[in-house]
Structure formats: structure tokens, C-alpha cells
């Protein structure tokens, strides 16, 4: 076994407890890393790898003052960082200075810096598996928000974690590998382990309303936070239980397909529904807006409550604009409260808190001035927190420094002892300021200066040419420079001691007073969190009102079953088009129109129309107004989509398999109150397979599910289903031919499309003319009823000499004696398995799935 120095042995002992993290080991002004940590960190951070002890121990380090930037880099890549500090004074230490890990920073526990997005929560999740389902707990350490839900299926757990963007998931070491793998891959999150779910006194207030299962799930998360953060978690709020049945369910694929919070291609906010809507003025409001989009309401009374407040704010333009200006000056109260509880709040944070509280009376008055009772009631609930404002006004200067060590935080008059020390310091400095003039007059040296530096303290500086003018015995030489000498006098030394003592006392007392002030502010955390909730709701509601007025949205109405949208518009496409004319479209469903079969050429707008209907429904159910001239909608409990064709690279599934899985998800879980969007189902396989599957799915949804369904297809043969299925109607996207080119009118009309215009689309894509002409010839032959297409390239002539073997033409097949085909063993097994199926007992979906599985075996 290798022999190490006591310091390296100390490092190894601490590292053994944090094997899944980089250990930032404090040595003087640096955080050092050793061994494998050093090798990996030097690559990830692109810093120099060195060594110690004769090259036997790899080593790298980062400066203490700039460590946060390096920590953020590692956290953004999914790593954890354990901060190990010196916890005793090196001057008084016997042997190796004592060190301890004071915090474990993980992707889910970031409290500050660039790793914390202003308008997004930073949730950490915990998942527990039970016999009858899964417990899910969520906590945002930066805001104090806590949520929990019991969820039946793992795919819904994944969808929820994806929605909130949790970067870390805490699980038990006993959770099965398959579930852990699914969570890690599907959620793309760091997995951490915690086995304690013990109830401790400080957590009782958080979990008092939870069931046993949710209590266990949240306490596992709480134990992990307590173990890693090693400080107060007093700002954590009582856990709010959310039931998936109380909000519209939108699965993971549908959230991506509809681009609710980020676009599919660039993964950016721009181009998403969130981007369109975000007119919030506070970070808190921005985060709440995202939560509302992720969880549309299904209770009509809650939807109407939001609608009513949006209507009020729309009706009072000037008051709304004043409200927006006031909200703009409110800082992030939730995260400020979190920093207070966490103990890392600085004086500028408290000044931001003070400036925010200054806006609250005006905001309350603005809302109360609105004539509607709902607005007055909301205003009456707002707590001004004026006692906290007065405390901060009395205690803090307006522009305090960033760090506590710089001092000058606490106002004069706040503490008598501090005033006394400051008077002593000021009097001493005034005396020194007068000293320069007195010494000049006394010595007759006009260039004499009184100065100060941290090494020698106060001094009197005289140029070397004038030193002979100084009175002997009165001045003591302190420092010699190239062209001057520096001296002190007994009086100067005495005053210096008084000033430095006063400043030391000021620094110590200011720190004590600030720490005490921080503890006083902690008492207000619950009130601040409630105020933050009220401000964020006002912000999200004014955001809806602002967008709705700016973009000419109308207030939707709700019905039991009817969809009646006049002049509906895709909200995001309309904004992106800006001043270009957007073609609105109607949508009528219900009363014999549960399924709309949409035909029309590529690029004509079928997918946009389908997404438009889903987004209008979501906007309506989050309480916003919608882009239409009139809208009556049912309340949808779920939205399912199958739009786009992208392989699932994470799980290695093909386009077609993803298509089938998404179709299965809709058909298994949709109800008659759901909305289903199927775009080009069946295109991932051969024509006849695809057409058969598409028809089977349409029939199954029509006969057994009853959900409102928009089904676009290129299979024009399916339009005959209108005469066979009572609730299905054909609609098409109108296009016209003009001088040999196709013009897309983007208008939805009743009936089926008369042709597909596929070759015209290829022409628009500027395929070579030879290909376009040849395709047109083939199409003409096929449309004439011919089952054979004349080859464009003639076959190469055969030679009569058998011994002269020539390369076959591309279209020629070498003739071979016909023999009875012999099946391979695996092919025979597939046929036998196919024969064993009882097709009469299978649903269309089960039959499709089995067929796909057999196809993969061949």
C-alpha cells in the first residue's frame, strides 16, 4: 500500500465519502483535485494537469475566487461537486488543518449562477416504486416549491419529469435496474441514490397532508437535500399534491410535437408557445407561466376564474400598463427568500428585496382601483410586508458593496456602538487630513504628503531633497524610496492605532449586525413566499391580457361536446409570419363529426391546421384567450399526437416503431373526451401495409374510443370511409393548378382532395427536369389502369454465346432453373407462430404490433 502525506491521506478519507463527485479540496487560495478527479477535471475544464510527490499523484486546481465558473461547467455536464473547506484557523491548528465538505452541489441543487435559469424552475425529483404505481416528489431548492403526485404508469412519471425539466432524480438503491435505466435515458437526468425516508421534526410541517406513499417519496428527497446541502432548509414550503386527473394530460411525445415550451429542432424557446405568450415582467411570473402551459386546467370553474381576471385586465388598458411597469421593478422574491434561508444572501440581495417591497403598495392600489369585485378581492389579499420594508430601510445603505468584508453596509443610527466606532474612525481620519497641512506649515515643505498603504500604515512622505528640513528626533524613518523618504511621528502612530482599531471593530460589528438582520428576515420567509405567489399570478394574468389584446384573441366559450372554431389561427405561425397575411380556418366537430379525415398535398398546411386546433384548446384551458373570431370548445382531458417522423435515437427505435407506439398510447389511454391528432399514420412502411394500418386505426378510434380525431393522410383511397363510418367527415386543404404549377391556398374545405399534387411539390423543390418528366410519364401510365410501367432504360441484349458472361443490365434478372423454395428454420418458426394467432380475439392494434414483431424476426 502506498504511503501518503497526512494531507493527501486526509483528501483520500474525504473523497471515499464522495466517490460520485469531484472533490474541490481547499488549499490556501485554490481548490485542488488529485488522482482520477484531476485527470478528468483537467479534460472537462481544459486546465493544466500537473503532479506532486515526484509525479506519482496527478493534480490540478482552480483559484478560489473564480471557482464558481468552473463548478458551473461541471454541473452543466451532469457532474456533482463536493466543496471541501478548511474549518479551523491554520494558525491555531495542530498538524493538518481540519477540513470538511460543507456542500455538495448537484444539477438539481444549484442555488445561484448561470446554471440557474431566471425564468425556469430548477426541480430535483424523487421517484419511488410501489406495487400499485409510483410516487413522484419535486422540489426547487432555489424557490422553496415542493410538489408530489401518485402516478399509475412509468411513462406518465417520465412525462411529468420531462415537463418540469428536472436535471436530477433521486431513487433508492433497491429500485430495479430497468426503471432506473428508463428514468435516466428518457429524462436525460443525473441519477442519485438515497435510502433514508426517516421523518425528522423539521420536515413534519412539510408532509403533514401527504399519504404514506407520498410521504415516503418526499422524505427520501428531503433526506438527500439535507445530506448534500448541510444547512437550513427552512424556506421549503408545504408539499402541494397535484393529481394528474385534475389537469389535462399531455404525454411526452405530444409536448414535443406541439412545441409547447421548446422547438423540436433547435430545442430553443423561440418558436414555441411559451415564447409567443411570454409577456411576463418578473422571473416568478415567467416560471409560473411555464407551469400553467405544462398543466392546462380541466375544471371549468378554475378556467373561468382566470378568464375573468384576464378580461378585467384587458378592459383597463392604462391600469394594466401601470401594473406592468411596477412588476418590472419587482425582483425574484421566491429566490431571494431561498437565499435568505440558505444563508448566502448578501447586502445587495436585501436591497433588491427592499426595492421590490417598495412597489407592492402601488400594485395593491392599482388592482384595488379596478371596479370589478374579483380584482378588489385579489388586492385585499396582498400582504404589504411593510414591517419588513421598514426594517430594511432602517438598516441598510442604498448601494452596499457586493461582499460583506468591504463593510459600509449598515446605516448610521441603526446601532449606537457602530456609530461610536465610526465617529472614532472619522475623527481620526479628519485629524490625519488636517495633519498634512499642519506638517507643511511646520516644516516649510510644500510637497510633503500624508499617505497610507496596507503594509506600512500611515506615513509622512518627503522628497529626498527636503529631508534636511525635518526636525531631528521628531520623525522616525519608516521606508526609503528611490526619490523620497517616509516617516512616522508618535502622534501619527497613536492616531493610526485608534483608526485601525475602530475600523476592525466596525468590520466585526457590521458583520454581526448583518448576520442578525439576516436571521430577522428569515422570520418573514412564509409571508414573502405568499407575496411572491400573488405577484407571479398577477404577472401571468396580465401577460395573457397583453398577448390577447396585442394579437386580437377572443374569449372562448365551453360546451359539452361541440367544437366550433371560426377563423382559427395557429398562434405561433401567425406571429412568425408577422405582417404577412395569415389564412384563418374553421373547425367544426361533434354532432356526427367526431373524426375529420384531412387530405391535400404536402406543404399545404395539414399539420399546421392540426397543431392549431390543439394549441387553441390548450390556450383555452390555461385561461388565455384564443386566436379566432369565435370559439366554442369542449374541455379535453387529454391530447395525443402523432406528428412528424423522427427516429427515437435514445432507445434505438425506428420511425415506424415510434409511430406505432404513439398510436398505441392514444388508443389505449384516450377517452371520448380526448383530442387525437394523427398525421400521416402508416407512411413508415409499405403502401398497402400503411393504408391497411391507417384504416384499422381510424375504425378502432371511431368505433371504440370516440375521441375527437384529426387524421391527415396521403392515402386518398381512405376517403371512401365517409360513407361507411357515421362520425367521419372528409375535409381537404385547397390547392389549385395555375400554368403547370400548384398554388397552395391553405384553406380547409369540405370533402376529399381530388389529387395529391406530389409531382408539383417535387417541382417546387427543384428536382431535375428529367426526374419530373419521367415521374409524370409513370403517373400517367398508372392512372390509366396499367399495372406495368414501361422501362425508360432498355435492357442490354443477350449474347447467344453462353460462355461469354456479360454484366447484367440494371433491369435484367438472370434466369435460373426454378426449384421449390426451401424455408429457413427461423422463417418456418415465424410461419408457425403466425398460424397460432387467434385473430378474432385480437384488437386491430394488437394485430399490428404482432405483425411488426414477426416482421423484425424475418
From Swiss-Prot:
Gene3D superfamilies for this protein: 1.10.1420.10, DNA repair protein MutS, domain I, MutS, connector domain, P-loop containing nucleotide triphosphate hydrolases
Xref: CDD domains: ABC_MutS1
Gene Ontology BP, a term: mismatch repair
Any Gene Ontology CC annotation: cytosol
Entry-linked SUPFAM superfamilies: DNA repair protein MutS, domain I, DNA repair protein MutS, domain II, DNA repair protein MutS, domain III, P-loop containing nucleoside triphosphate hydrolases
PROSITE patterns: DNA_MISMATCH_REPAIR_2 (PS00486)
Acyltransferase recorded as keyword: no
GO molecular function, a single term: damaged DNA binding
Keywords: ATP-binding, DNA damage, DNA repair, DNA-binding, Nucleotide-binding
Family annotation (InterPro entries): DNA_mismatch_repair_MutS (IPR005748), DNA_mismatch_repair_MutS-lik_N (IPR007695), DNA_mismatch_repair_MutS/MSH (IPR017261), DNA_mismatch_repair_MutS_C (IPR000432), DNA_mismatch_repair_MutS_clamp (IPR007861), DNA_mismatch_repair_MutS_core (IPR007696), DNA_mismatch_repair_MutS_N (IPR016151), DNA_mismatch_repair_MutS_sf (IPR036187)
NCBIfam families documented for this protein: mutS1, PRK05399.1
Family from the record: Belongs to the DNA mismatch repair MutS family.
Protein name stated in the entry: DNA mismatch repair protein MutS
Organism of derivation: Bacillus pumilus (strain SAFR-032)
Amino acid at each position: 500500500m502506498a504511503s501518503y502525506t497526512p494531507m493527501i491521506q486526509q483528501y483520500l478519507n474525504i473523497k471515499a465519502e464522495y466517490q460520485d463527485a469531484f472533490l474541490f479540496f481547499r488549499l490556501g487560495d485554490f481548490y485542488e483535485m488529485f488522482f482520477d478527479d484531476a485527470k478528468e477535471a483537467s479534460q472537462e475544464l481544459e486546465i493544466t494537469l500537473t503532479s506532486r510527490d515526484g509525479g506519482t499523484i496527478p493534480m490540478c486546481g482552480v483559484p478560489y475566487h473564480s471557482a464558481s465558473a468552473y463548478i458551473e461547467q461541471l454541473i452543466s455536464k451532469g457532474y456533482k461537486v463536493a466543496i471541501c473547506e478548511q474549518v479551523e484557523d491554520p494558525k491555531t491548528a495542530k498538524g493538518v488543518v481540519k477540513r470538511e465538505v460543507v456542500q455538495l452541489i448537484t444539477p438539481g441543487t444549484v442555488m445561484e449562477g448561470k446554471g440557474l435559469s431566471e425564468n425556469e424552475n430548477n426541480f430535483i425529483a424523487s421517484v419511488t416504486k410501489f406495487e400499485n404505481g409510483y410516487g413522484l416528489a419535486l422540489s426547487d431548492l432555489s424557490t422553496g416549491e415542493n410538489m408530489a403526485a401518485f402516478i399509475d404508469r412509468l411513462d406518465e412519471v417520465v412525462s411529468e419529469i420531462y415537463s418540469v425539466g428536472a436535471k436530477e432524480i433521486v431513487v433508492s438503491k433497491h429500485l430495479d435496474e430497468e426503471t432506473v435505466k428508463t428514468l435516466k435515458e428518457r429524462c436525460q437526468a443525473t441519477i442519485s441514490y438515497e435510502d433514508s425516508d426517516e421523518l425528522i421534526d423539521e420536515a413534519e410541517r412539510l408532509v403533514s397532508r401527504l399519504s404514506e406513499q407520498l410521504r415516503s417519496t418526499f422524505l427520501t428527497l428531503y433526506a438527500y437535500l439535507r445530506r448534500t446541502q448541510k444547512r437550513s432548509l427552512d424556506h421549503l414550503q408545504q408539499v402541494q399534491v397535484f393529481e394528474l386527473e385534475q389537469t389535462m394530460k399531455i404525454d411526452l411525445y405530444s409536448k414535443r410535437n406541439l412545441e409547447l415550451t421548446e422547438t423540436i429542432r433547435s430545442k430553443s424557446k423561440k418558436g414555441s408557445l411559451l415564447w409567443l405568450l411570454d409577456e411576463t415582467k418578473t422571473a416568478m411570473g415567467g416560471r409560473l407561466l411555464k407551469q400553467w402551459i405544462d398543466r392546462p386546467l380541466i375544471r371549468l370553474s378554475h378556467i373561468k376564474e382566470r378568464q375573468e381576471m384576464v378580461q378585467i385586465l384587458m378592459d383597463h388598458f392604462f391600469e394594466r400598463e401601470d401594473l406592468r411597469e411596477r412588476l418590472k421593478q419587482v425582483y425574484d422574491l421566491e429566490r431571494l427568500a431561498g437565499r435568505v434561508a440558505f444563508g448566502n444572501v448578501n447586502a445587495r440581495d436585501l436591497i433588491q428585496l427592499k426595492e421590490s417591497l417598495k412597489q407592492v403598495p402601488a400594485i395593491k392600489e392599482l388592482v384595488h382601483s379596478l371596479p370589478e369585485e374579483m380584482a378588489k378581492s385579489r388586492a385585499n389579499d396582498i400582504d404589504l410586508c411593510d414591517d419588513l420594508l421598514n426594517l430594511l430601510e432602517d438598516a441598510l445603505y442604498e448601494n452596499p458593496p457586493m461582499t460583506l468584508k468591504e463593510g459600509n453596509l449598515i446605516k448610521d443610527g441603526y446601532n449606537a456602538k457602530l456609530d461610536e466606532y465610526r465617529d472614532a474612525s472619522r475623527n481620526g481620519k479628519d485629524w490625519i487630513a488636517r495633519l498634512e497641512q499642519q506638517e507643511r506649515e511646520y516644516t516649510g515643505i510644500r510637497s510633503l504628503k500624508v499617505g497610507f498603504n496596507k503594509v506600512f500604515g500611515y506615513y509622512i512622505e518627503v522628497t529626498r531633497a527636503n529631508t534636511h528640513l525635518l526636525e531631528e528626533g521628531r520623525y522616525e524613518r519608516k521606508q526609503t524610496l528611490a526619490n523620497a523618504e517616509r516617516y512616522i511621528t508618535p502622534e501619527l502612530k497613536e492616531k493610526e492605532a485608534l483608526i485601525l482599531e475602530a475600523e476592525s471593530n466596525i468590520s466585526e460589528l457590521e458583520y454581526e449586525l448583518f448576520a442578525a438582520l439576516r436571521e430577522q428576515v428569515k422570520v418573514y420567509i412564509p409571508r414573502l413566499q405568499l407575496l411572491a405567489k400573488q405577484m407571479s399570478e398577477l404577472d401571468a394574468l396580465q401577460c395573457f391580457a397583453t398577448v390577447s389584446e396585442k394579437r386580437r384573441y377572443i374569449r372562448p366559450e365551453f360546451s359539452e361536446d361541440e367544437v366550433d372554431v371560426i377563423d382559427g389561427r395557429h398562434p405561433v405561425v401567425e406571429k412568425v409570419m408577422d405582417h404577412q397575411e395569415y389564412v384563418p380556418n374553421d373547425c367544426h366537430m361533434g354532432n356526427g363529426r367526431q373524426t375529420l379525415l384531412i387530405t391535400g398535398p404536402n406543404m399545404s398546411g395539414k399539420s399546421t391546421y392540426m397543431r392549431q386546433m390543439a394549441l387553441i384548446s390548450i390556450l383555452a384551458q390555461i385561461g388565455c384567450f384564443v386566436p379566432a373570431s369565435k370559439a366554442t370548445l369542449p374541455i379535453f382531458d387529454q391530447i395525443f399526437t402523432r406528428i412528424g417522423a423522427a427516429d427515437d435515437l435514445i432507445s434505438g427505435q425506428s420511425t415506424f416503431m415510434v409511430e406505432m407506439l404513439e398510436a398505441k398510447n392514444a388508443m389505449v389511454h384516450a377517452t371520448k373526451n380526448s383530442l387525437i391528432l394523427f398525421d400521416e399514420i402508416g407512411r413508415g412502411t409499405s403502401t398497402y401495409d400503411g393504408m391497411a394500418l391507417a384504416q384499422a386505426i381510424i375504425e378502432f378510434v371511431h368505433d371504440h374510443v370516440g375521441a375527437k380525431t384529426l387524421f391527415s393522410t396521403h392515402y386518398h383511397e381512405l376517403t371512401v370511409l365517409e360513407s361507411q363510418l357515421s362520425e367521419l367527415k372528409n375535409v381537404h386543404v385547397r390547392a389549385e393548378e395555375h400554368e403547370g404549377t400548384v398554388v397552395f391556398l391553405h384553406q380547409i374545405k369540405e370533402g376529399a382532395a381530388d389529387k395529391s399534387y406530389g409531382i408539383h411539390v417535387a417541382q417546387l423543390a427543384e428536382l431535375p427536369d428529367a426526374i419530373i418528366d419521367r415521374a409524370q410519364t409513370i403517373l400517367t401510365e398508372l392512372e390509366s389502369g396499367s399495372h406495368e410501367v414501361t422501362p425508360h432504360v432498355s435492357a442490354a441484349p443477350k449474347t447467344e454465346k453462353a460462355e461469354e458472361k456479360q454484366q447484367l443490365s440494371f433491369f435484367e434478372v438472370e434466369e435460373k432453373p426454378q426449384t421449390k423454395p426451401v424455408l429457413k428454420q427461423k422463417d418456418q418458426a415465424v410461419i408457425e407462430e403466425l398460424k397460432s394467432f387467434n385473430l378474432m380475439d385480437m384488437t386491430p392494434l394488437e394485430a399490428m404490433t404482432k405483425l411488426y414483431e414477426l416482421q423484425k424476426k424475418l
